[in-house]
Amino acid sequence: MAISTSLLIVALLIKLCLVNTAPPISKCFQDGILIAELKSSSGISEFCIKDDISILKSEITYSKNDTGIFMHSKVFRHWTVADWKQCNHTSAGGSTNVLEVDKNLNLVAKNYMCTRPCVITIDKENAQLLFQTEQLNQFEVTGTTISTGWFKSKTSVSLDNTCEHIKVTCGKKSLQFHACFKQHMSCVRFLHRSVLPGYMASSICQNIELIIIIILTLAIFIFMCIITRTYICYLMLPLFAPIAYLYGWLYNRSCKKCICCGLAYHPFTNCGSYCVCGSRFETSDRMRLHRESGLCQGFKSLRVARSLCKSKGSSLVISILTAMLILSFITPLEAMTTNYPDDKKFTLKEVNDIVLGRDMEQELKSSILILMSICGIGIILIFFGLTVLLEIVLELIAKRSTIFCKECNLIHDKKSMTYRGDFTNKCGFCPCGELEDPEGLVIHTTRKSCTYYIKIRNLKLIMLIFSIVILMQNATMLVVAGENCWTNTEIKADCVGPLIGPSACTNKGSKTYKTVAQELVTASKITQLDADKYVLLGDTIESALDAITSQKHYSAMHLLETMFLMKHCDYYKVYEHNSGYSQTKWRLIAIANSFDICTNTPTPNFCKCLSDSSCSTTTLNFATSMNATYTSKVEFFNHDFTLFLDIFEAAFPGSATAFLFKKIKEKNPYQAFEMMGKIANKYPNNKLLVVILKYGQYMVGLSHASTYQLKQEWVAKSLSLTRAQRTGLKMSMANAEPGPATKECSDAKTIACLTPKFQVEVNNLMSCGASPNFKIYVKTGELYKAHDRNSVWCLNDMHCLTPYTPANAEIITTMKKMDCWQDNPKQPTDEYAIPKRSCQMKDRGLCNSGADKWKIIKCDNHKLFYTDALERRDPASIVGSNHCFSEKCQIERYPINPTSLTNCEWLYRAVRPEYIKKLSLQTIEEYKKAIADKLTHTLQLYHFAPLLENLPHIKPTYKYITAQGTYTADGIEGASITTSIPALSGTSVGFKINAKDGTDLLDIVVYIKASVVKSIYNHIYDTGPTININSKHDELCTGQCPKKIPADPNWLTFSQERTSRWGCEEFGCLAINTGCVYGSCQDVIRTETKVYRKANEETVMLTVCITYPGHTFCTDVNAHEPKITDELELQFKTIDIKSLPNLVAVTNHKLYTGQINDLGTFGQMCGNVQKTNTSHTGAGTPKFDYTCYSASRKDIIIRRCYNNNYDSCRLLNQESDLLFDDNHETLVVYNNKRLNGELALKLLLGDIQYKLYTENMELELEAKCVGCVGCFESYQCNLQITSSLDETALYLVPVSHFHDRIQIKTTKKDYAMKISCTRDPGDKASFRVCGKSYDFNFHTVPKNDKIEVNVGDETSYIKEKDNRCGRWLCRVRDEGLSVIFEPLNNFFGNYLNMFLYILGGIILLFLALYILMPMCARLRDELKRNERLHQMEMKKR
């Protein structure tokens, strides 16, 4: 029995060993490549995640030693696209998402792009994008069409949207363009995806409007036929009754009667059996007798109306009219959304600025009406007063400073005048300088102008005195602090802010901190270095007060406070009253809080005065009502004294608060008693302020005040008693001088100097060389030891590429008056001091370093390194994308500061999209060669230079307009036309310009090429869905969780206590209902969406093209200022601008708007996880679970870290009307589909001598036309015309042309025009010009382009077609005529026209015989009857 038991135990042990040694089951995938591992006391969570090229997983094992439990974490990768490295990828940004692992095993999502060469072309006939490469590459199409994939040779992507706004990327090439089909493609896509082939779907959709109106007509007709079989049809009696009545009236009045039946004449039919009254007769004679005898009751219109209600013909007519009526009302609608700002809540610190701003706004609003009403009168009175008073004052001064000499009858100036008996030393001389003729022929007489010189001299004196008075007034502002306050080295009670504030404030708001600082420099109160500190005050009141209170020394605080009070001279002036913007903050604190002493019974008079401003401040009796309470209850004193200090700090920020805190900190609070008393005496009318200050005087006199402990933040605001010192050796700079230009510095020292009076620090200086002849430079960056010499220091990096900036003589002169210290520079330990052998390359290129060209690699962390092995990859890199800096990565190199390099030419700049290139060809032969070379084009646009693209695709509608100007015997001088045109892209209008006598002059086409509202947007962050969560966690066997859980920046922390229990604890932990699991986490997102913020206000830009025959030009005009040139004048008549959104999101090259978080805000909407550069930010409460194991650590499962509402980004509104140019970090967003107003234009035509023109003249004309039939470009024609006379030529062509008349000049030979052909004109076509026939040579390129490519801001053919013919009936008219007649016309040619003319003649003849003949016969009989009556009347006479 014992043996069997022993055998059983051995068997169980062997089985247990076999189980323990069995290979573990691998999660996610088997094997894989180990890419990173780490041993640490905190572990990561297990994950299995896939990116675009691989799958990653993590494995964690635990080990324990004497120091604790450690986690061994490993990360493995399994390739799904094994050969993706062949595309020569780089992390310059792209569409390939790759997850990498940093040194802490955190997942980092990066985007890579391939750099293999790729050729992008477009097949316009098949509407396909073509990609071609030699090795593995990746393409991506985003925008209205989305497609991506890998390929090795050729591939294509079909375009099927009506208008495509797409971004195409292949390899390192990226293009952005706009393309539109000839027709709307939504219908074609719908039908083509069914059983219909493509050409049939295109034909149906080309005539879809006609098909729809026919189907609707048939549907209505069938419905009408059904109701005609019921009595419901008589509901249409009100419709047909008026028609029947009108027909009956015309029947009786207008038609000749048949001699057989008495009814209306009917030449083509027999006499009927029914009379118009409804009676039936067997013979026509009885009917005639019935009509002639007067028994017929007349035409029964209701009978005819009832017949029409039952008639199928009338039903068909009603069906056609109803269908046309219904479809004529189908037009697009446009709406506008207005966003109203949400209410804003202000903090207590902002309240001063808000109240001041609102007070100023209210004051402005209340006084603007008064200012407007007295403005005109005031200006008149001022000028009148100056004129009158100045003249009077100058006249009085002139009389007092001059005398009239009776001896010489002249005026003399009293200045420097002496008497010589009855004469003076100035006799014979007049102040005006005019001399008498010695011969006595010209005698000078005294005039008023003789005193002008004296008046001007006195006027200069008055202006000088006035200027001095103004300067003295401004200078008095500088003395507000008293002379002793500027010389004090420590704060005193008389030199605090409320006591040194200016007593007068007459120029409120007229000064800036900069002007105030310069006034202090002028008054020799401070140096220029002190004055430059005004920038610390900022732009608002709170920023200035924060700058003042943050100073640690009295001199600096006094300086800034003086500047502040000189600018805001009324800050303490309003304390003379019981309200004001500067009192809002401390009064809010006093009202919102309560003193503990006020809870006692009876209530002290002090508490009553806090709520009643009419109480007397002489009956407060603090000692009587408060001593007992504060003596027994120290906590009451501490609370109330703290509240008093809060109020005092809000009321008197700056030096007054600093003085009080300083005395409390020194345990001498009673020394502040005098300061508070002086402040109370200065503002006796401010009752609440006086009460609080007297309360403060009482409180500082109590014994508890000496033991009161200031809060830490208040201790920091108390002034320091000692002057600042600097580390290093104090040195004399008496022999210092500016250093020479150099890039290297030996014996480098950093210099720190302090101004002797205000201790303004100057620490951006350094010296080179030995003592005492220091060479001084401005320290513009960090100092590094050269990487190859320890005694040499470099600027900004370790390569000595940046030159030092010598200090100027003014700075050195100032230094010699300061106390300066020298210290040895410290070698930084930042990224520029860390060498590397390789890195993940983001870009590469050549940069200028002085006169040399350096080969540079830009790493994924934006650091730049010199390299001489650009194509060498580091075999030890994880992803295989690290590039060596030297052969085989043997040499370590240091980063180069970007400021040391210039004119960098990067090879991978193509990650930023390029745009369509436009080429203007000067000759018709070049244009012919360009469009005929091949059908598959690169993305380039070719234009014939004389026409460019300044004409619309469709011939515009012409209007007649009369030229304005001066009409002469030869024609018009200064001819011009004035008109207006809607500011809408694609709008065009033609003008046939006539003279007043009706003479045709010339044709002009005005074309709005682009009318856009645009704005620039800056990229602020990326967002996307969460694909993984990085985490670090640890656990404690016993105890509580740490109060501060360690976490990296932007990581969220989580914790849970009482996690240890039986069966759920690590090995060796015997605990129940205690312990803790804690850690931190951060989301890893796939960046799918970029968010941009508007950087400037919207601008309206309009491009207007004017095309004369043979001359064309375009000009731009904005909405704010007119455009005036020698050829035209443009100005917006009306402006209607729709604001662009403030925030936009771009996903797959599509623009979205809606509820989007701004940078730094994390609301529950799109964009609450934000990636900026390499950091992720977000907010939320992590949710996590853990899995228990016996005698082992727990597995942490992070359910959620950040709140990521990326799903709401998919619900944003796509802005199909907004287009944009993607410039990587910026967007140019524009709307070219909106009517932006009305543009008034005046075209200046110059002189037109049309009366000298002749009708018929001989021309030497040679014409060549190149183009295609029915394509976007039409035919471009070049005309070579030689004429001996100026002429306006009328040309007649057998095709559609954009101009009927051209103006021929003797000085010009080349002309250009555009014509459209619906069929091939052949090699030659006959044109008539000036009455003569000429042959035009044509070259037709066989093209069937389905798609038109442009840059997006210009209008396309389909948009111009929609603008021209946007309603259903217009489309039906065009499509119906083209469907019926175009195939016949192509087959029969001119014979079809002959047939149509004959058919039209037959129809007119039929109408004449059937309708006009009876009416004419009736008219003839009526005329004969009147003739017979006239003859009978004549016989009776």
Curated annotation (Swiss-Prot):
GO biological process, any: symbiont-mediated perturbation of host process
tRNA-binding as UniProt keyword: no
Keyword vocabulary terms for this entry: Fusion of virus membrane with host endosomal membrane, Fusion of virus membrane with host membrane, Glycoprotein, Host endoplasmic reticulum, Host Golgi apparatus, Host membrane, Host-virus interaction, Membrane, Signal, Transmembrane, Transmembrane helix, Viral attachment to host cell, Viral penetration into host cytoplasm, Virion, Virus entry into host cell
Cytoplasmic compartment segments: 229-312, 395-460, 1413-1437
Transmembrane segments: 208-228, 313-333, 374-394, 461-481, 1392-1412
Site (Cleavage) residue list: A481, G482
Pfam families found in the cross-reference section: Bunya_G1 (PF03557), Bunya_G2 (PF03563)
Disulfide bond residue pairs: none
Topological domain spans for side Lumenal: 22-207, 334-373, 482-1391
Domain of life of the native organism: Viruses
Protein modification: Specific enzymatic cleavages in vivo yield mature proteins including nonstructural protein NSm, Glycoprotein C, and Glycoprotein N.
A GO cellular-component term linked to this record: membrane
Glycan attachment points: N65, N88, N627, N1173
Record has Membrane as a keyword: yes
Signal peptide positions (record): 1-21
Family named by the database record: Belongs to the orthobunyavirus envelope glycoprotein family.
Quaternary organization: Glycoprotein C and Glycoprotein N interact with each other.
Role according to the record: Glycoprotein C and Glycoprotein N interact with each other and are present at the surface of the virion. They are able to attach the virion to a cell receptor and to promote fusion of membranes after endocytosis of the virion.
Name used for this protein in its record: Envelopment polyprotein
Organism: Bunyavirus germiston
